């Protein structure tokens, strides 16, 4: 079992004692929400780790207790450039504020040594598990497997961070990383073994000579460069208290920009060697001693990482990267041993063996270099966790094969649709065409409760956004009176965009289905905006009721007087007036605003008409009941008004909204829009795949049951040919959409924008072609309301305009293609 993060503390070592009163005064002044008059203030030291001393701060009154983590430079004379806590703070803040990489939230940095003796920073305490022993003793085999897969995915997530976009472009030099690292760590080694310090090992010089002669060519080109953690091991990960997923990557002291394959190799050290501070010697790793049951082999771990990160198989240069990692570890352990001799090693007496271990690591590196084969030339063929029921989804095998969890959810979803949704479609349509169209069918609310019980609720919620919302809400009062199970249910099943794609497609087979599972537009996009960009108060006031399905929402962006496909044209004004904003303007095609349950709009307008054109727009949460909001009329789409949620034209006349409702801050609207539209567009594409499948199914059934000119439609050669071509186009589009989802998971909105644009162009055009042919096969019945085809077609046609018209997306695709060509 893993060790609880709170159980890894011990008494403060004498060499690391400092003024607790000074720390308290600093924290009270600089940490938001830090108790100022506590009855308890306790500082303990974490015993795990050999580098920057790390401490647990516990502060509170009565039964209320808050915990924080302090990380500081060690005292005494230090090696140049080592123990840079300011760099740790910088990278943690950038990742925490701008990415979904799981890291603890940082609160403040102090560089004044007068406070507690050395520089330090304070961050959140993450309640979870740390696995100190890579063998994962007392862990079930299937959980060992899941933990190592989660480790590989966490590393891939870290490596996907766009350093240029998050302000880390100058965090280090990217090219010639290994060359510089060899020089740096060799200098550190020499400094740690100078006169009066541990004796130098001649074999270290032999190892350095080999490394310098075998640096991969990719290192100088920067082809493998990006953010590097520098000490990525399983014991530097915090796992969820009960789930096998990473919630925090810690110990960033060695982070920089450079060759990311060095991180990958270092994370595999336990396969090569077994190094433990409480052991006198380095022993052999899992490759020699054998894998614990359920453990991934090194090739399987690498395959998991390469699949998640999109990196090529590293066989060609693997020997170098492992030898380099062993060399660096030897240099680090030599430095630890030198500090132990001086009496200021963070690990205390546990560091007494590091001198011997450093020399044994050098021997291990030279032994690894002498091996003929270290990694298979090609990645292993891993038997995926796939159910035989997948055969009904697609024949053969390929890259995008859903795992067992997704397949089980998919089967439940299909059964729910067949049992409850399809039989109710006519009833829902009748109400939507009656005088009571702007009311909600009572059966819909019953179906929602059933969907919750079945675990089919809020499946769209991305695992990273859910983690952020949980963190934000953890420190607030539970004013919604949610039990643990009810609270967890709000955040779905922890799916990636790729995994959700298989389920969203099923919902897309009916225009009525998405809202039953609380996965309908515009609510999903609005909820994701608040999940990603909302503060604690906004999450509590608006997101929780939306996630519960108690209210619905609208999105107000498009305006009748301007071409709104260019968001810089938006004219609606949002003027600051004291503690409020005053909104004036007209919006139309405000989806969801006609719904009687609609309580909040996300409105896009301009807060500064004189700012740079992409900094003029802001987004703000607007309560629908605010005076000055007037719904002028419902709008129709080819005659469909999409009751009961509808699309409204709305005027805003001096609508006063609290300033606290602004999302992310003034001038961030364009940024939010891009973040919202990426997943939102993809959800539309996924649903369109389902709509096309429904069209194919109805078309084939009709062709097999209706005769023209003496034979069934299915017997006409032209129909068979058309049907085959449509199937080819549908499958190609499905793969494109899944590829876009995969890119969105791995690389984020910005890097995936090209393939997202391709999917957004391809999906509606393909669906229209399929549905148009299905309508044609049905004849007059196809354009009537007796089938779902006309409504599905109208929705698909709208999506060639909504969330960006085809022309805008084609422009994006073309520009990226030209940029690619210009770099050749």
UniProtKB/Swiss-Prot annotation:
**BP GO annotations:** fatty acid metabolic process; root hair elongation
Example of a GO cellular component annotation carried by this entry: peroxisome
Catalytic activity, per the record? a 2,3-saturated acyl-CoA + A = a 2,3-dehydroacyl-CoA + AH2
Fetch the SUPFAM superfamilies from UniProt.
Acyl-CoA dehydrogenase C-terminal domain-like (SSF47203), Acyl-CoA dehydrogenase NM domain-like (SSF56645), Protein kinase-like (PK-like) (SSF56112)
Q: Which cofactor does it need?
A: FAD
Q: What happens when the gene is disrupted?
A: Defective in root hair expansion. Mutant plants are resistant to the inhibitory effect of intermediate levels of indole-3-butyric acid (IBA) and 2,4-DB on root elongation.
- Among its keywords, does the record have Acetylation? yes
> In this record, what's one Pfam family?
Acyl-CoA_dh_M
Q: Does the keyword Lipid metabolism apply?
A: yes
Concerning Gene3D superfamilies, the annotation shows: 3.90.1200.10, Acyl-CoA dehydrogenase/oxidase, N-terminal domain, Butyryl-CoA Dehydrogenase, subunit A, domain 2, Butyryl-CoA Dehydrogenase, subunit A, domain 3, Phosphorylase Kinase, domain 1
* Cellular localisation: Peroxisome
Predominant subcellular localization, coarse grouping? other
**Residues found modified as N-acetylglycine:** 2
Q: Which GO terms describe its molecular function?
A: flavin adenine dinucleotide binding; oxidoreductase activity, acting on the CH-CH group of donors
Q: Provide the top EC class.
A: oxidoreductase
Supply the alphabetized keyword list: Acetylation, FAD, Fatty acid metabolism, Flavoprotein, Lipid metabolism, Oxidoreductase, Peroxisome
- Residues that bind FAD: 555-565, 589-591, 706, 776-780
Motif stretch (Microbody targeting signal): 822-824
Its annotated function is as follows: Involved with IBR1 and IBR10 in the peroxisomal beta-oxidation of indole-3-butyric acid (IBA) to form indole-3-acetic acid (IAA), a biologically active auxin. May be responsible for catalyzing the first step in IBA-CoA beta-oxidation. May play a role in defense response to pathogenic bacteria.
**Protein family:** Belongs to the acyl-CoA dehydrogenase family.
Query: What more does the record tell us?
Result: Plants over-expressing IBR3 exhibit enhanced susceptibility to the bacterial pathogen P.syringae pv. tomato strain DC3000.
Q: This chain belongs to which protein, by name?
A: Probable acyl-CoA dehydrogenase IBR3
């Amino acid at each position: 079992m893993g060790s609880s993060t709170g159980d890894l503390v011990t008494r403060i070592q004498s060499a690391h004692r400092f003024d607790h009163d000074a720390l308290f005064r600093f924290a009270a002044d600089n940490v938001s929400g830090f108790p100022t008059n506590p009855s308890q203030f306790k500082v303990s030291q974490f015993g795990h780790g050999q580098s920057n001393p790390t401490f647990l701060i516990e502060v509170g009154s009565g039964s209320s207790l808050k915990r924080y983590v302090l990380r500081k430079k060690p005292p005494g004379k230090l090696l140049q450039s080592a123990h840079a806590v300011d760099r740790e703070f910088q990278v943690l803040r950038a990742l925490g504020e701008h990415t979904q990489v799981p890291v603890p939230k940082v609160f403040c940095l102090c560089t004044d040594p007068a406070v507690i003796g050395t520089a330090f920073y304070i961050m959140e305490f993450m309640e979870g598990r740390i696995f100190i022993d890579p063998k994962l003793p007392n862990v079930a085999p299937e959980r060992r497997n899941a933990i190592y897969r989660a480790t590989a995915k966490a590393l891939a997530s870290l490596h996907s961070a766009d350093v240029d976009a998050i302000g880390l472009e100058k965090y280090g030099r990217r090219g010639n990383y290994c060359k510089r690292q060899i020089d740096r760590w060799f200098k550190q080694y020499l400094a740690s073994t100078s006169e009066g310090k541990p004796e130098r090992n001649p074999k270290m010089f032999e190892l350095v000579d080999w490394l310098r002669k075998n640096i991969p060519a990719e290192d100088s080109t920067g082809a493998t460069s990006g953010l590097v953690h520098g000490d990525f091991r399983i014991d530097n990960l915090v796992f969820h208290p009960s789930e096998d997923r990473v919630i925090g990557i810690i110990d960033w002291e060695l982070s920089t920009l450079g060759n990311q394959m060095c991180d990958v190799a270092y994370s595999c050290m336990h396969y090569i060697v077994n190094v433990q501070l409480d052991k006198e010697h380095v022993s052999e790793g899992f490759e020699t001693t054998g894998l614990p049951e359920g453990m991934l082999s090194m090739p399987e771990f690498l395959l998991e990482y390469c699949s998640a990160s999109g990196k090529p198989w590293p066989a060609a240069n693997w020997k170098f990267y492992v030898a380099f990692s062993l060399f660096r570890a030897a240099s680090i352990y030599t430095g630890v041993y030198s500090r132990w001799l001086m009496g200021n090693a963070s690990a205390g007496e546990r560091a007494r063996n590091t001198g011997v271990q450093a020399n044994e690591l050098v021997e291990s590196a030279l032994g690894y270099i002498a091996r003929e084969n270290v990694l298979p030339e090609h990645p292993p063929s891993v038997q995926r966790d796939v159910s035989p029921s997948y055969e009904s989804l697609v024949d053969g095998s390929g890259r995008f094969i859903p795992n067992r969890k997704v397949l089980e959810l998919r089967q439940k979803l299909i059964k729910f649709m067949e049992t409850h949704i399809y039989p109710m479609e006519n009833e829902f349509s009748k109400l939507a065409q009656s005088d009571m169209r702007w009311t909600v069918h009572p059966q819909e609310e019953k179906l929602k409760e059933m969907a919750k019980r079945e675990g089919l609720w809020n499946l769209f919620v991305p695992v990273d956004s859910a983690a952020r919302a949980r963190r934000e809400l953890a420190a607030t009062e539970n004013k919604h009176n949610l039990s643990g199970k009810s609270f967890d249910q709000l955040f779905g099943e922890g799916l990636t965009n790729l995994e959700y794609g298989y389920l969203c497609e099923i919902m897309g087979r009916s225009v009525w289905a998405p809202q039953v599972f609380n996965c309908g537009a515009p609510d999903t996009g609005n909820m994701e905006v608040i999940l990603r960009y909302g503060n604690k108060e906004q999450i509590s006031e608006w997101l929780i009721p939306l996630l519960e399905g108690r209210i619905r929402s609208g999105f107000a962006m498009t305006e009748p007087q301007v071409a709104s496909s260019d968001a810089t044209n938006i004219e609606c004004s949002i003027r600051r007036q004291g503690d409020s904003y005053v909104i004036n303007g007209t919006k139309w095609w405000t989806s969801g605003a006609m719904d009687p349950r609609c309580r909040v709009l996300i409105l896009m307008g301009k807060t500064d008409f004189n700012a740079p054109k992409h900094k003029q727009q802001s987004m703000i949460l607007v309560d629908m009941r605010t005076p000055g909001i007037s719904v002028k009329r419902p709008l129709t789409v080819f005659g469909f008004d999409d009751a009961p949620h509808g699309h409204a034209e709305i005027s805003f006349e001096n609508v006063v909204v609290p300033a606290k409702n602004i999302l992310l801050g003034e001038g961030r609207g364009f940024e939010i829009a891009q973040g919202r539209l990426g997943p939102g567009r993809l959800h539309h594409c996924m649903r369109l795949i389902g709509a096309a499948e429904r069209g194919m199914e109805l078309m084939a059934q009709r062709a097999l049951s209706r005769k023209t000119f003496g034979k069934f439609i299915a017997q006409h050669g032209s129909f068979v040919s058309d049907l085959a071509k449509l199937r080819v186009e549908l499958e190609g589009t499905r793969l494109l959409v899944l590829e876009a989802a995969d890119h969105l998971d791995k690389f984020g909105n910005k890097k995936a924008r090209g393939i997202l644009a391709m999917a957004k162009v391809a999906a509606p055009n393909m669906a229209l072609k399929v549905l148009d042919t299905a309508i044609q096969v049905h004849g007059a019945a196809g354009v009537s309301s007796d089938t779902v085809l006309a409504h599905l077609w109208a929705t698909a046609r709208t999506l060639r305009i909504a969330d960006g018209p085809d022309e805008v997306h084609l422009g994006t695709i073309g520009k990226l293609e030209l940029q690619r060509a210009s770099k050749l």
